[in-house]
Amino acid sequence: MNKLIDEITKGQLNPDVPSFRPGDTVRVHAKVVEGTRERIQLFEGVVIKRRGAGISETFTVRKISNSVGVERTFPVHTPRIAKLEVIRRGKVRRAKLYYLRNLRGKAARIKEIR
């Protein structure tokens, strides 16, 4: 049964996903349906966590919008993501960057990998 599930989910995986880690700044081009129209909505921020494996893998992106922190969680292999761009690589020593929620301004910056 487990092999059958693996074969089915293997076909669902998106091969166009770039490699990214927590601390990286990414721009997500998400497809949003409003009524009968479908449009692309950009969401750019820092990846604060990545969890799961295979088809159920998700990542959370955090950005500051109008001085309010906004976090959005996306499945990695969803067809609702039109494109995923890595803007800059960040150097962090944690897998989950929840501590960024309590930091403001320049303290919330992440060092860039050169």
UniProtKB/Swiss-Prot annotation:
Reported function: This protein is located at the 30S-50S ribosomal subunit interface and may play a role in the structure and function of the aminoacyl-tRNA binding site.
InterPro entries named among the record's database cross-references: Ribosomal_bL19 (IPR001857), Ribosomal_bL19_CS (IPR018257), Ribosomal_bL19_sf (IPR038657), Translation_prot_SH3-like_sf (IPR008991)
PANTHER family with a match to the protein in the record: LARGE RIBOSOMAL SUBUNIT PROTEIN BL19M (PTHR15680:SF9), RIBOSOMAL PROTEIN L19 (PTHR15680)
Heme is among the record's keywords: no
Gene name, Swiss-Prot/TrEMBL: rplS
Record-given protein name: Large ribosomal subunit protein bL19
UniProt keywords, alphabetically: Ribonucleoprotein, Ribosomal protein
Species annotation: Listeria welshimeri serovar 6b (strain ATCC 35897 / DSM 20650 / CCUG 15529 / CIP 8149 / NCTC 11857 / SLCC 5334 / V8)
GO biological process per UniProt: translation
SUPFAM superfamilies in UniProt: Translation proteins SH3-like domain (SSF50104)
Family listed: Belongs to the bacterial ribosomal protein bL19 family.
Gene Ontology CC annotations of this record: cytosolic large ribosomal subunit
A matching Pfam family: Ribosomal_L19
PROSITE patterns linked: RIBOSOMAL_L19 (PS01015)
Molecular function per GO: structural constituent of ribosome
